[in-house]
Each structure stands twice: as C-alpha cells, then as structure tokens.
From Swiss-Prot:
Residues the record lists as binding substrate: D96, S97, G98, G99, F100, D150, Q193, G220
InterPro entries the UniProt entry points to: ArchSynthase1/Queuine_TRR, TGT, TGT-like_sf, tRNA_ribo_trans-like
Protein's UniProt name: Queuine tRNA-ribosyltransferase
Biological function: Catalyzes the base-exchange of a guanine (G) residue with the queuine precursor 7-aminomethyl-7-deazaguanine (PreQ1) at position 34 (anticodon wobble position) in tRNAs with GU(N) anticodons (tRNA-Asp, -Asn, -His and -Tyr). Catalysis occurs through a double-displacement mechanism. The nucleophile active site attacks the C1' of nucleotide 34 to detach the guanine base from the RNA, forming a covalent enzyme-RNA intermediate. The proton acceptor active site deprotonates the incoming PreQ1, allowing a nucleophilic attack on the C1' of the ribose to form the product.
Organism: Enterococcus faecalis (strain ATCC 700802 / V583)
UniProt lineage: Bacteria, Bacillati, Bacillota, Bacilli, Lactobacillales
Matching PANTHER family: QUEUINE TRNA-RIBOSYLTRANSFERASE
Record key words, sorted: Glycosyltransferase, Metal-binding, Queuosine biosynthesis, Transferase, tRNA processing, Zinc
Length: 381
C-alpha cells in the first residue's frame, strides 16, 4: 500500500485547552501547525513575491480553483508543470474546491444533484461545476492539499434546507474521492458543513469520517455569524474530527479568531483579511488595528508597530507609508500587506511556542488585553 500524500504528526497537546502542536507532511515539504495560510487567489499573494513569503515564515499558501479555472485555465497550468512551477513556489499549496465562489453567486446559479450551473462572473457565460470537475481541475493544478466540492449554505438557512445540503455534500464528497486521480501525490480533505445545527454537524462529520479522508475542513463559518456563534459551533464540531487528522477552519483570519480556533483544536486557517485590509491602509498591530491613512499619522515617524521586528517596521514610518497610500503608490500596499501577513504568521509562531510551554491561556489573555479584544467570547477552560 502506498504512503498517503499527506500525513499529520501530533507533537504535543496543550494541558489546559484543546490546542495541539503538530506538523503536516506534504509532497512539497513539512509545515508546523497551528498555521495561518496566506491566500494567493490567482496564483499570487497580492503584491508579495515567493521570496518575501518565505522570509516572513509562510510554510504553505492557498490558491483558488474557481478563479484559476477561469483564468488562465487548469490545462495551461498543467502544461507549465503544475501550480508550483507556474508560480515559482516550491513549498506546499492548498487549493479550495471552487464551491464557495460558485455558491456566493446566488443570483446566477442553480444547484442540482449533478453539480451547479452558474454564470461566469467575468463575462456572464454559462458554466457547470460538478464534484468530479472540481477534483479534475485540482488534479491538473497539482496542489498538495485539495478540497472536496461542497455546498456552503448561509448560516441562517432553515434546518430543512441545511439537512438536504449536508446530505448532498456527503454524496458529492464520495464522488470526488472516486474521481481523485492522484491520491499518492495530493491529499484530499472532506468539508464538514451544517451551519449552526449540532446534530447536522455531527451527521456531516460522521459521513465524512467514514470515508477516511487524510484531513478535514470545517466550512460554513466566518460567513456573518457572531464570534460567539462560531466558537459555539467549533466547541461541538472540532472533537468530531479524528485526532490523527489535520483540522482546517476555512476563511478565518482575525487574530482573536485564530487564537480561539487553536484553543478549540484547529490546526490550519486561511483568510484574505490581512491583504484585503492592507490595501485600504489598515494594519494589524499589537495594540489593535491602525488605519495608517488617517490624518493623525501624517507626521508620525514611528513604525506601524513598535513591538514588530518585520522588514517594514524596521525600515519605514507611519508617515511615509501614509504618504504612499494617499498617493496610490503600489509600494505602500506592498508594505502594509507584508506587515499584516508577518503579524499573523508571527502570532501563530508565538501561539505554537505557548502550546509548547503550556501557557496558551495566559498568552491569550495578555494578547487580548493589549489588542483590546472582548475576552467574553472565550470559552472557560
């Protein structure tokens, strides 16, 4: 029997929470967990070079199947030698299934058992995405970690609808597993859905765990529900995933949500948040968010974050970065993007150390107090 493409190794459990320290072994290298994954939607993390991402400690990045299918097309990427060669990234890559993007086109799509009919958001042409097609595209892209095609229903959808949805997602997951051409080179994750309904999350997890995926994602969160709701769902969903498999919380990137996810046993996170807010001149700092384009920073010659040792904070001032952003200079966006990504990657590095030292709850409390978060969102341990 061949070795699975990806393997999770548990290194240490936190004594006081559900947090765990581990590593994920993939065909393109091993990365430590818990880990935040920068998002490179179109085979690039906006304005960042691969060298800069490595420099700041990004052990794995995410690319988007839907967008790469539309442009430049999976066949072209395959011809280039796969996504790693195409974008000159020699470390692990995770691709999503395209499902979230298709389902967010709510006024332009129709769901059937076979798959989803929708209109291309670029030119309005009719397209069809099935579980098999989503896997086929990802096989051609050559990512290390692939996602099953799933439906992501709105968090406030009715119980009856969500029940039908998770049952269909389970059938789609089974079809995707059968269609997967490279299980020895690419690991496929199942995605647990169920909105805020505990029994439906349990059913979804049970179905998927019975299929023995090498890893599992928790989907359908960070879609507008409160932090308390998200934590409530994680409290009963994460334990449903086997301990020997990686657990990935999709679309989460706020610092407090990362820490609270880790406390509940999550290993992997991704989000466009750090680069998206960076393009608007908003920076993550140890004191909370800083909107550097605001007038109060015009003559502020301090770094973005005086406690940060990233390249940006060692070399540039708030005043200079504000000037660049106010003048629509791309370099300003590069600087804020670099800093925000570094901030989250460094946060996760510190979280991993806190798990190693068995003081994650103390770390969380100190971080939240300095950042200004409401600690009431936390579960008591």
């Amino acid at each position: 029997m061949t070795e699975p493409a990806i393997r999770y190794r548990l290194i240490k459990k936190d004594k006081h929470t559900g947090a765990r320290l581990g590593e994920l072994i993939t065909p393109h290298g091993t990365f430590p967990t818990p880990m935040f994954m920068p998002v490179g939607t179109l085979a690039t993390v906006k304005t960042m070079s691969p060298e800069e991402l490595k420099e700041m400690g990004a052990g794995v990045i995410l690319s988007n199947t839907y967008h790469l299918w539309l442009r430049p097309g999976e066949d072209l990427v395959e011809e280039a030698g796969g996504l790693h060669k195409f974008m000159n990234w020699d470390q692990p890559i995770l691709t999503d299934s395209g499902g979230f993007q298709v389902f967010s086109l709510s006024d332009m799509r129709k769901i059937e058992e076979e798959g989803v009919h929708f209109r291309n958001h670029l030119n309005g042409s009719k397209m069809f995405l099935s579980p098999e097609k989503a896997i086929n595209i990802q096989n051609k892209l050559g990512s290390d970690i692939m996602m099953s095609f799933d439906e992501c229903p709105p968090f406030d959808e009715s119980y009856e609808y969500v029940k039908r949805s998770i049952e269909r997602t389970s059938r789609w997951a089974e079809r995707g597993l059968k269609a997967h051409a490279n299980p020895d080179r690419q690991g496929l994750f199942g995605i647990v859905q169920g909105a805020g309904f505990e029994d439906l999350r349990r059913q979804s997890a049970k179905d998927l765990v019975s299929m023995d995926f090498p890893g599992y994602s928790i989907g359908g969160l960070s879609v507008g529900e409160s932090k308390e709701e998200m934590n409530r769902v994680l409290d009963f969903t994460t334990p449903l995933i086997p301990e020997n498999k990686p657990r990935y919380l999709m679309g989460v990137g706020a610092p407090d949500s990362l820490i609270d996810g880790v406390i509940r046993g999550i290993d992997m996170f991704d989000c466009v948040l750090p680069t998206r807010i960076a393009r608007n001149g908003t920076c993550m700092t140890s004191q909370g968010r800083l909107v550097v384009k605001n007038a109060q920073y015009a003559r502020d010659f301090r770094p973005l974050d005086e406690k940060c040792d990233c390249y940006v904070c060692r070399n540039y001032t708030r005043a200079y970065i504000r000037h660049l952003i106010k003048c629509d200079e791309t370099f300003g966006i590069r600087l804020t993007s670099y800093h925000n990504l570094y901030f989250l990657l460094d946060l996760m590095k510190n979280v991993r150390q806190a798990i190693m030292d068995d003081n994650l709850l103390e770390f969380r409390q100190a971080f939240f107090e300095e950042y200004g978060f409401n600690k009431a969102n936390a579960k008591s341990f």
